Structures are given as C-alpha cells and as structure tokens.
C-alpha cells in the first residue's frame, strides 16, 4: 500500500508540475483577426504572406534565431489542418522550455479569429531547441495534444519591454483590424 501511495503522489505532482496555469480568456471587444496582421501589428515586423512563409521572408531583413525573446515572432510550419501555418508574438519567457505568446485565430469553430493574450507554449523538442512545440488549447483547458514543428523566431529590430508589449495586445488587435487580408 505505501508503494501505491508513493506512486499516486508522484503522478499527481507530475501532472501538476507539467501543466501551466490557465491563460486569460480571449480578449473581448476586439475584432476577429487572422494571425498574420495581428503579429505584424504587435511585433512591428513588417512581413506579409502566409504565416509559414515568414521564416524565409525574414532572411536578410530581420534577424532569425532558435531562442525566444520578447517581441519575437514564433513561426509554426504549415500542416494539413493548418495550411497557412501560424505566427504568434512572444510576450515573455517563463522558463527554459515555456514562453507566453499573444496570437490570433488559434482554433476552430467559435474560437476562430479570437485574439488570445498570454498563451502558454511549451518546447517539447528532444534537443531543447524550440523546433517542436505544444500550444495551450483554451476549450480543453490544457495544452493541446498536437506537436507543431516550429521554424524558429523572427526577431524585432529592437527588443521591446515585456510589460509594454503585453499592454499593447488589445491596441495592436484594433490596429490590425484595419489591415486584414494583407
């Protein structure tokens, strides 16, 4: 019996330790957006086109890297269910393998087009290099089960203050609403 209790306790503690706290609810009072115009408005990185193409489009124009930094744009590769890929803006780094991002249009159905602030993203890559991530899934109240290939981080020209960056999420969504479709 003591062995079972120890096993149960370690499983419970492990489950608690591996689950980040829930992020705030999606922003109310902001228009529905695609991820690209929102990421452009919040990060100041002036790239266009499908999200997955941002990595190559940044070459020679913006620094790129494998490490997260506030204001950097995380570029996720396209998949069969996410044909344009996805971009999100790093707000802050929580730990070696966890960041918080702001993004738009993550999800489907009623979640489509919403702007979400302070969303956990976890590095699950075997080499700890941010090449494979899992993203918080609001409707399920936990990390999504899908692993997404990440192309890397497109870095802004200057490093923004994380507090100001987080405060600019809603204003950036309103700015992006005027640039939809580009």
Where are these regions (language model features)?
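N-terminal export leaders
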Residues: 3-8
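Intrinsically disordered, low-complexity segments enriched in polar/charged small residues
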Residues: 9-10, 169
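Bacterial signal peptide processing site
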Residues: 17-19
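Secreted/periplasmic proteins that engage bacterial cell-wall peptidoglycan
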Residues: 25-89, 94
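Aromatic- and glycine-rich peptidoglycan recognition patches
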Residues: 96-182
């Amino acid at each position: 019996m003591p062995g079972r209790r120890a096993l149960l306790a370690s499983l419970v503690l492990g489950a608690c330790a591996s689950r980040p706290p829930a992020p705030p609810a999606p922003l109310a009072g902001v228009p529905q957006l695609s991820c690209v115009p929102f990421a452009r408005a919040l990060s100041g990185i002036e790239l266009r086109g499908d999200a997955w193409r941002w990595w190559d489009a940044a070459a020679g124009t913006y620094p790129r890297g494998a490490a997260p930094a506030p204001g950097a744009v995380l570029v996720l590769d396209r998949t069969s269910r996410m044909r344009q890929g996805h971009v999100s803006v790093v707000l802050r780094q929580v730990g070696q393998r966890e960041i918080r991002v702001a993004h738009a249009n993550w999800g489907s159905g009623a979640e489509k087009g919403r702007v979400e602030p302070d969303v956990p993203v976890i590095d699950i890559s075997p080499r700890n290099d941010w090449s494979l991530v899992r993203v918080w899934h609001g409707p399920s109240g936990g990390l999504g089960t899908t692993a997404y290939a990440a192309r890397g981080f497109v870095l802004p020209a200057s490093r923004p203050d994380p507090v100001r960056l987080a405060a600019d999420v809603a204003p950036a969504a309103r700015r992006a609403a005027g640039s939809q479709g580009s």
